[in-house]
Amino acid sequence: MAATLTVQDHLVHFYHLHALDWVSPVEALAADPIATANLQNTVLNTYKLPFRAPGASVTEAYEHDFPAATPQYFNEIKEKVKAIVESGQLGIFSANWWDHPDYKLLPPEVHLMAVAHYLEMLDKQRELVTPHVIFGGKNPHPHYVVGGMPCAISLEDGNAPVNTARLSIVDRAINMGRSLANNYYLPDLLAI
């Protein structure tokens, strides 16, 4: 639970609380989707720093969560952001100074890549906290099991709070956290 909280906390703080201090959805509109796809591949090849867990804790044959790196994907994101900006109601992108000159320090393709990952992490962060739900915790301040207050575990009973199916969900969340840190967070942090 603590590890998934740490990864989720870093993702939320980077993408949702700090990224828009450095990247702009308005600047992303000037990006070329083909150049952005090439940039995404370059960033992954250059900045991927594999976070490795002990071998016994790796339970998936391969990583499942990679950033999309196709021109079609980035064109879809660009069109989505364009519709939001042109509507004049920026919603999640409101209350910023998009005309500030420092937003021009990064190329538009970095802005588009980062905004795409910002949007992806809105969904991914929800999945990362499922271990908190399964073990009866909450976020961002999980309840840890106090002595004398056991959590019912049964690998056979489908109604037990912790069972085989729920443990596989926890395992998936842990592996997802590792993939997101390796393939999104660390490369984006170094690129931006």
Annotated model-derived regions:
Residues 1-192:
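Active-site bordering "gate/hinge" segments
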